[in-house]
């Protein structure tokens, strides 16, 4: 009879100890969770700050930086490729998207107003004459022009024409390819190299150059050679296309040989930045 109260008191004490222990565990868990949330918030803020910093740096670096501060050779080449390759890659990606869209619409019977407008815009930008009649779309000409210039080929030509981004024309005009301005369209802004096209950014320079190769009558044979590769289901590469670029330089084949040799010498370095 005496044992029963003792057992009851013992049970009560055990329950109290259990409650106290549980409260401490919950308190610690809450503190840990709060600490984790605080850590995540700080990490998130750091990520936002990094993105903002990247955005600011991207805006600042829209023009070609002064690459002469890098030692000549590999360090300067790497700095140049880090600067120009994103724009070349982006340009070719945009072209590929438009080309794929054209291919997907090639056998389409009915066109929506939005599709007509898009086709009209592409034809205009690539200087392809089109009456607007969807039954008479110049597909061969469109697909011959709306195509990539091999990324490594563009990078090699930019490096060759600009001295890896150190020429006065590249630094002052953002002109990486030695593109001359048309008569009556040249602007003689202070500090710019006269007689040559001036661009507001590296991106604009790359876009103008690629568009020039894809539209100018002088490079018709280059585009036809590229179209033949497509027809044969072969890859459009720098190795295949550099020697197909005729009429680009007054030096003729010797320039193509020089360009190809430069590409071969820097092929691995360029590939590492693609």
From Swiss-Prot:
Question: Record's superkingdom?
Answer: Bacteria
Is Heme tagged as a keyword? Answer: no
Query: What are the record keywords, sorted?
Result: ATP-binding, Nucleotide-binding
| SMART domains xref list | LYZ2 (SM00047)
Query: Which Pfam families does its entry note?
Result: Glucosaminidase
Cite the residue spans of the region called Disordered.
Answer: 32-74
State where ATP binds: 247-254
One MF term in the entry's GO annotations: ATP binding
Listed Polar residues bias regions: 32-64
Q: Does the keyword Nucleotide-binding apply?
A: yes
Protein name in UniProt: Protein bax
What species is given as this protein's source? Answer: Escherichia coli (strain K12)
At the highest ranks, the source species' classification is: Bacteria, Pseudomonadati, Pseudomonadota, Gammaproteobacteria, Enterobacterales
């Amino acid at each position: 009879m005496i044992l029963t109260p003792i057992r009851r008191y013992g049970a009560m004490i055990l329950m109290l100890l259990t409650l106290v222990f549980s409260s401490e565990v919950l308190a610690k868990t809450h503190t840990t969770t709060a600490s984790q949330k605080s850590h995540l918030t700080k990490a998130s803020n750091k990520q936002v700050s990094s993105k903002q910093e990247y955005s600011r740096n991207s805006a600042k670096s829209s023009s070609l930086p002064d690459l002469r501060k890098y030692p000549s050779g590999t360090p300067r080449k790497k700095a140049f490729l880090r600067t120009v390759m994103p724009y070349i890659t982006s340009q070719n990606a945009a072209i590929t998207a438009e080309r794929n869209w054209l291919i997907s619409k090639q056998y389409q019977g009915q066109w929506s107003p939005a599709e007509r407008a898009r086709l009209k815009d592409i034809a205009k930008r690539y200087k392809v004459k089109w009456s607007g009649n969807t039954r008479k779309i110049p597909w061969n000409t469109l697909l011959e022009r709306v195509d990539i210039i091999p990324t490594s080929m563009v990078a090699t030509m930019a490096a060759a024409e600009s001295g890896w981004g150190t020429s006065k024309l590249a630094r002052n005009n953002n002109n990486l390819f030695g593109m001359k301005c048309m008569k009556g369209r040249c602007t003689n802004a202070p500090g710019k190299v006269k007689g040559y096209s001036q661009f507001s950014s590296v991106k604009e320079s790359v876009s103008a150059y690629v568009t020039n190769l894809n539209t100018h009558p002088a490079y018709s044979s280059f585009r036809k050679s590229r179209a033949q590769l497509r027809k044969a289901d072969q890859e459009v590469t720098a190795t295949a296309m550099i020697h197909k670029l005729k009429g680009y330089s007054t030096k003729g084949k010797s320039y193509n040989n020089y360009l190809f040799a430069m590409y071969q010498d820097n092929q691995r370095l360029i590939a590492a930045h693609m």
